[in-house]
From Swiss-Prot:
Official protein name in the record: Movement protein BC1
Family in the record: Belongs to the begomovirus movement protein BC1 family.
Chief location: host cell
Entry superkingdom: Viruses
Membrane topology annotation: Peripheral membrane protein
Function: Transports viral genome to neighboring plant cells directly through plasmosdesmata, without any budding. The movement protein allows efficient cell to cell propagation, by bypassing the host cell wall barrier. Begomovirus genome is shuttled out of nucleus by Nuclear shuttle protein (NSP) and the movement protein transports the DNA-NSP complex to cell plasmodesmata and facilitates further movement across the cell wall.
Residue ranges crossing the lipid bilayer per the database entry: none
GO cellular component, one term: host cell plasma membrane
UniProt subunit comment: Binds to dimeric supercoiled plasmid DNA.
GO biological process, one term: transport of virus in host, cell to cell
């Protein structure tokens, strides 16, 4: 169901929705809020303004028996985010506790898009039947516009407990944290050697984020994932003596072939000479010269 619209706010009042009864449900069910009228939104859009929620008040008034048990969970979602990341703030309180919930937005939104904020409730661990009209909700919104967005100081959600039998120990509320942001600068091997940094050249199919995570800095080498992808990228920082693989396989093979020869060339020549002489002496018959008488 879409959020209802109402007259635009001014600096001193809030847009109030009707105090309506809601049925008990174990699933997230939308609480209808009223926002500025379509005409007011178009007027702000034509003036190229953006909008934010300065303050949101959700009034909860229970109408269950005194022995009713269970917890009510109220959540604010920003539909600009994916479904598993849209939750911005949540409150959990006893089903019998009358309470006012306060929320302060920390971001602007464009009026060219649908109003992104949605308010939901659900009931858990209760002994009250489903579809019972267990409570009334009423929303109050104070919005503002600006020519452009600015940084908004963070204000945590708060509560105002109206039932005396309950205290802060019975209430829980939370707010989403700032999104994590990590950047790593690239340093090539040649530039990091001299402490220089050069521009990053992107090629087709590459992105700034992926390109700028490649480097040889010490911080980049700390990532286990990066080390698994590029296990040898930092070998250039080792000395040449460590990187020298030694003699090649061919040199080692030749050395092994020559390892059984322990004679010098002169010794080899002497062996050949003596062998030849021995063969001549053994195979040739010496003839005594005849004398002439």
């Amino acid at each position: 169901m879409d959020s209802q619209l109402a007259n635009p706010p001014n600096a001193f009042n809030y847009i109030e929705s009707q105090r309506d009864e809601y049925q008990l449900s174990h699933d997230l069910t939308e609480i209808i809020l009223q926002f500025p009228s379509t005409a007011s939104q178009l007027s702000a859009r034509f003036s190229r303004s953006c909008m934010k929620i300065d303050h949101c008040v959700i009034e909860y008034r229970q109408q269950v028996p005194i022995n009713a048990t269970g917890s009510v969970v109220v959540e604010i979602h920003d539909k600009r985010m994916t479904d598993n990341e849209s939750l911005q703030a949540s409150w959990t309180f006893p089903i019998r506790c009358n309470i006012d919930l306060h929320y302060f937005s920390s971001s602007f939104f464009s009026l060219k898009d649908p109003i992104p904020w949605k308010l939901y409730y659900r009931v858990s661990d209760t002994n009250v039947h489903q579809r019972t009209h267990f409570a009334k909700f009423k929303g109050k919104l104070k919005l503002s516009t600006a020519k452009h967005s600015v940084d908004i100081p963070f204000r945590a959600p708060t509560v105002k407990i109206l039932s005396k039998q309950f205290s802060n120990k019975d209430i829980d509320f939370s707010h989403v944290d700032y999104g994590k942001w990590e950047r790593k600068l690239i340093r090539s091997a040649s530039l990091s050697k001299y402490g220089l940094q050069g521009p990053i050249e992107l090629k087709p199919g590459e992105s700034w984020a992926s390109k700028s995570t490649i480097g040889v800095s010490h911080l980049d080498a700390d990532s286990d994932l990066d080390s698994a992808i590029h296990p040898y990228k930092n070998l250039n920082r080792l000395g040449s003596s460590v990187l020298d693989p030694g003699d090649s396989a061919s040199i080692i093979g030749a050395q092994r072939a020559q390892s059984n020869i322990t004679l010098s060339i002169a010794q080899l020549n002497e062996i050949v000479r003596s062998t030849v002489n021995e063969c001549i002496n053994n195979n040739c018959i010496h003839v005594q010269p005849k004398s002439l008488k």
